[in-house]
Amino acid sequence: MTNIGSLLVDAATLMVTGMAVVFIFLTILVYLVRLLSKLVPEEVPEPIAAPKTNTRVQSTSSAVSPQVVAAISAAIHQHRASIAK
């Protein structure tokens, strides 16, 4: 049977080797991405024209009638009064 010390040395060697390989791979990947970002021009989107705003005021026929406003106000007042009790 193999000595526990040699097993630990083998495990540490394997761990350090794996970590070194991953570190080198990630370092190369970072530099390749930086290189590609400098080589490939950035796509600049065309400016979107702002939609024209309608400056016309809506006609008063589509506005809420004063009777509806009064009814809504009365309903809100009644609701708040019933909650306060």
UniProtKB/Swiss-Prot annotation:
Database matches in InterPro entries: Na_pump_deCOase (IPR005899), OadG (IPR023424)
Could you confirm whether the keyword Transmembrane appears in this record? yes
Q: What is this enzyme's catalytic activity, as reactions? A: oxaloacetate + 2 Na(+)(in) + H(+) = pyruvate + 2 Na(+)(out) + CO2
Q: Set out the biological process GO terms recorded for this chain's protein.
A: sodium ion export across plasma membrane
Report if keyword Transcription regulation is assigned. Answer: no
* Function according to Swiss-Prot or TrEMBL: Catalyzes the decarboxylation of oxaloacetate coupled to Na(+) translocation.
Q: Which family does it belong to?
A: Belongs to the OadG family.
Record HAMAP family: OadG (MF_00404)
Q: What is this protein called?
A: Probable oxaloacetate decarboxylase gamma chain
Q: Origin organism of this chain? A: Vibrio parahaemolyticus serotype O3:K6 (strain RIMD 2210633)
Gene encoding this polypeptide? oadG
